Amino acid sequence: MKLLVKKLANTDIGILLRNSLNFKPVSFKYLKKDYPISISDAFLWRTDNGYKTKFKYSDILYLFYKIKNSWVEFHFYSKNNKLIKVEKVNDLNLSNELEISSEYLNNLEDYGTFYIYHFSKNTKNLNNKDIISNRCYTGYSQNNNLYSFVHGNTLGKFTSIFSNKTFLTDIVITSVFKKYTYTIQKCFDGYDKNELFFTNPTSKTIKFTIESKNYELKPNYSLLVEIKNSIISINSNCLFFRPIIFSYHKKYLDVHHS
């Protein structure tokens, strides 16, 4: 009987009930796959207000598995989850860099999310439980000032390393009710402006409240929110809902995860 209850408690419905009742909540889904997978964070790109974005990434498959001739794909989405660009990169170096400007995105001045996936036809050194996750560093420069870099913050999507074109989400788990409160460990006093970047890495609508204002973020949408208070608490129905922070002081820009 205990084994049956435990099994039911770990199903998708069981986890949803646990999270909604705040009974042994689960923040991340355990990925039970019989093939090696590539996981990507939901990275932010910005080309609005004089911004450009720089992305630094590694050839993970060669670095750790000595697999040659692998490649990566970048998938760029608008803030409303519209696919706007896919780019395949072959001939990887150990360390690589991509600059994302408005020109790169067909003169689009906005913001959104992008994902990076590692693919290979060579499976010699991989087993079916391997998970490739390139957390990477993303830099942001406004008006050609110095870049401020931050590493990956939110696990977003995953796919087979064999490039089968099926992309799955819901690594981060939600609940039915807004039961979860996260207070950012930062005092926002002394800055000219502060922005929080949110992305929804799930297939469910995330409902959240900041500074007594209610928001709804549809699946895989993203949103920039300017804040005014010195201490910020986020109440939501997502168990891991952590924004990227942009803090401005004169010409100084500080970007970091919360």
What are these regions (language model features)?
Residues 1-258:
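Gly/Pro-rich, tryptophan- and cysteine-flecked surface segments typical
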